[in-house]
């Protein structure tokens, strides 16, 4: 679920949840920073500001036998510039929040396998775009803007290891001497887990509150409830906060995108040109619940049920938490980093509101939540009824989606008469999907099938499975479709556990390009009720070098330890199928417009292949390589 689209939806749909930062009424005691949300823009700023440093950095990194690859105390001018700007921005953010109890910096460590699949797709897509841009500049004999392989911002690389050491040994000790905050902590890239999930693991462990212990005001209360502030740009932070009973505000840069004049005017009044904003999660929780309660009341005015109280303060706390968990679970259906969205689902107000109304209609009849807040397990009776309802409305979702997709055209298109030829070609690359769809008969024919509406319901399903799963005959592949459905259902269970209690199954991932159709999912649940959701023991995280081998395309092999890089390059005849050339990728352009929306079709990489590579090269790792591959824990800065 992309944060720009989701955040835009929230800002348009709910008033009173955004505040200027700093804010006199908000006094967080605990401040947590999802550091990758700072590192990436800092690196981009330094690339644009210091082009000579970038050139030098690329030269130093390419000398694989040089000091850069063996001396962990050697820092380039580019790295020093990044450290300086990173420190400046951290000082600004800490100065806004002024925490008194906890300052916690979390950097993305080794991710669960499900996240690695998404990272791999994203890195291949970036490699494809980078190569195409280089081709365009060569064609017009133009000097390209400075570039640097930002895949280096991955656990296990030299760059990120040294950046973590800078924070540990230089920045945070200085901050410790100058600050009155009680506890300063660093959760670096060698500690497993995504940054935002590590933050919430810490909150759950050190600030436990029952889901029935709710507080609807994000301020410091007389009872001593601590207010937690988290800096970050990821939509995951919103979902994680909704599943946590603590009082939380999110800090982020003020957004600059709203679809309508009315939205822009309202947000401008609320924020008055501030650079940073607070997102009040407790207020957002209230708006979600108020919206649901209003729909329940309107749809069943004569009902004397206890789920329609006179105010939020009298709402059954268990019901409140259950409604919020269900809301998060519903958002998974729009897709996230771990599961693709259902065909016909996209984050826009009409679709989200339609699903909420359907959910309310089911809940007021069944009084069952999708998720049991005590166990974190899905209630398959409620889930079955839900997918039956979605299946009954599947064609309307698809029709609305296709209609909206056909209206979409590139903004600021390449036909601008003031554009130079190179600008027009770069713009055409940005709108890669739109132009490829227009000029590829096979794709145009496929899209026409989806435009036929309910009269071609079976044809639409056949076309969908052929495009995303390579299935020519659904009748001959019922067993495969059953496997797809069961994988997806387990993925929903995995997701809610990941957001509520943390990740137990590090190895699970969804191995397909698309979600099953609602018809097949509904029929599968009905035929095999209850669907078995396997219990798994806690599975340990992968190591940093394993993640590098999972997520890096061959164009970024320079970031690997020398022994591994040499082995891979010598054996590309064998490993090449798992590491395809980024210049020759096919993309999913169906009903897409922009390149950033398209996922490349790349082969899945078995963990056995990764383990084989590591086993064959482990004797060639030097001391620096070994340090980069070690697992760490949260470090307290004394």
Tell me what each language-model feature is.
Residues 1-638:
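Noncatalytic, typically N-terminal accessory segments of nucleic acid-processing enzymes
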């Amino acid at each position: 679920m992309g944060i720009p689209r989701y955040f835009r939806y929230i800002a348009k749909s709910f008033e009173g949840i955004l505040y200027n930062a700093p804010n006199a009424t908000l006094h967080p005691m605990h401040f947590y920073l999802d550091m990758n949300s700072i590192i990436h823009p800092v690196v981009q700023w330094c690339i644009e500001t210091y082009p000579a440093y970038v050139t030098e950095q690329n030269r130093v990194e390419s000398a694989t036998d040089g000091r850069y690859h063996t001396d962990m105390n050697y820092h380039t001018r580019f790295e020093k510039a990044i450290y300086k700007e990173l420190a400046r921005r951290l000082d600004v953010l800490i100065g806004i929040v002024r925490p008194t109890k906890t300052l916690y910096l979390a950097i993305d460590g080794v991710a669960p396998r499900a996240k690695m699949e998404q990272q791999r797709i994203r890195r291949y897509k970036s490699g494809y775009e980078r190569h195409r841009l280089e081709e365009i500049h060569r064609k017009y004999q133009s000097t390209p803007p400075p570039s640097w392989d930002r895949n280096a911002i991955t656990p296990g690389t030299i760059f990120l290891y040294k950046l973590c050491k800078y924070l540990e040994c230089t920045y945070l000790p200085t901050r410790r001497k100058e600050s009155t905050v009680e506890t300063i902590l660093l959760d670096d890239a060698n500690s497993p887990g995504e940054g935002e999930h590590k933050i919430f693991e810490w909150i759950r462990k050190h600030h436990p509150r029952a889901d029935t212990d709710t507080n609807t005001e994000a301020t410091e209360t007389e009872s001593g409830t601590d207010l937690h502030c988290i800096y970050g740009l990821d939509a995951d932070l919103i979902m994680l906060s909704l599943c946590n009973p603590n009082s939380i505000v999110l800090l982020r840069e003020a957004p600059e995108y709203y679809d309508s004049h009315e939205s822009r005017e309202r947000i401008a009044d609320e924020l008055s040109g501030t650079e940073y904003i607070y997102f009040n999660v407790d207020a957002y929780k209230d708006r979600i619940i108020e919206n649901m309660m209003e729909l329940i009341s309107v749809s069943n005015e004569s009902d004397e049920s206890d789920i329609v109280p006179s105010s939020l303060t009298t709402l059954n706390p268990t019901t409140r938490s259950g409604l919020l968990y269900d809301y998060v679970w519903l958002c998974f259906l729009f897709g996230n980093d771990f599961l693709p969205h259902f065909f016909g689902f996209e984050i826009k107000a009409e679709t989200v509101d339609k699903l909420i109304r359907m959910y309310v209609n089911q809940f007021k009849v069944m009084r069952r939540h999708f998720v049991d807040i005590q166990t974190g397990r899905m209630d398959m009776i409620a889930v079955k009824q839900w997918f039956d309802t979605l299946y009954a409305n599947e064609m309307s979702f698809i029709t609305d989606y296709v209609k909206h997709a056909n209206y979409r055209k590139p903004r600021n298109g390449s036909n601008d008469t003031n554009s130079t030829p190179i600008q027009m070609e770069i713009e055409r690359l940005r709108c890669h999907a739109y132009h490829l769809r227009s000029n590829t008969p096979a794709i145009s024919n496929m899209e026409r099938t989806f435009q036929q509406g309910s009269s071609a319901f079976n044809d639409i399903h056949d076309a969908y499975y052929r495009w995303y799963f390579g299935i020519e005959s659904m009748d001959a592949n019922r067993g495969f479709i059953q496997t797809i459905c069961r994988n997806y259902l387990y993925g929903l269970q995995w997701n809610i556990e990941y957001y509520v209690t943390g990740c137990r199954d590090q190895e699970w991932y969804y191995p397909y390009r698309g979600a099953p159709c609602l018809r097949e999912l509904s029929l599968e649940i009905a035929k095999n009720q209850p669907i078995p959701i396997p219990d798994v023991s806690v599975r340990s995280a992968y190591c940093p070098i394993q993640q590098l081998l999972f997520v890096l395309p061959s164009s970024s092999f320079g970031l690997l330890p020398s022994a591994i890089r040499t082995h891979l390059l010598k054996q590309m005849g064998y490993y090449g199928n798992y590491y395809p050339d980024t210049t020759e990728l096919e993309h999913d352009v169906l009903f897409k417009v922009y390149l950033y929306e398209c996922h490349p079709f790349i082969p899945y990489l078995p963990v056995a292949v990764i383990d084989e590579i590591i086993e064959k090269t482990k004797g060639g790792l030097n001391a620096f390589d070994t340090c980069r591959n070690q697992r760490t824990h949260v470090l307290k800065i004394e």
